[in-house]
């Protein structure tokens, strides 16, 4: 019988883990029965999907708790699984502060030779 994810979301993490253990035991029993031929066509398939659903909901709940625990911390201090997903080049790119920094020589040149804006009038 199919277990709904919404029903699992109402349970706690411990209860979901117990439920997953029950489903694993049921799946093992179904695999043993498979050899004798007493198992329906979709029984093993539904048991595997139920187990996947239970483990998915458990992971969601754990991540929700982690997000609450790390709320307000800077991105650099977050665990990698909670950081925003970026592609490789964006992960390696300089930050905005690093881009804005100038060397002493650059700052001196900028102050000595400011940008000249020419006005054009007819």
UniProtKB/Swiss-Prot annotation:
GO CC annotation terms, alphabetical: cytosolic large ribosomal subunit
Entries under Pfam families matching the protein: Ribosomal_L29
Coiled-coil region list: 10-69
Gene Ontology MF, one: mRNA binding
UniProt KW keywords: Coiled coil, Cytoplasm, Ribonucleoprotein, Ribosomal protein
Location(s), subcellular: Cytoplasm
GO terms (BP aspect): maturation of LSU-rRNA from tricistronic rRNA transcript (SSU-rRNA, 5.8S rRNA, LSU-rRNA); translation
Family statement: Belongs to the universal ribosomal protein uL29 family.
Assembly information from the UniProt record: Component of the large ribosomal subunit.
Entries under PANTHER family matching the protein: 60S RIBOSOMAL PROTEIN L35 (PTHR45722), LARGE RIBOSOMAL SUBUNIT PROTEIN UL29-RELATED (PTHR45722:SF2)
Identification of the protein by name: Large ribosomal subunit protein uL29B
Organism this protein belongs to: Encephalitozoon cuniculi (strain GB-M1)
Organism phylogeny: Eukaryota, Fungi, Fungi incertae sedis, Microsporidia, Unikaryonidae
The gene coding this protein: RPL35C
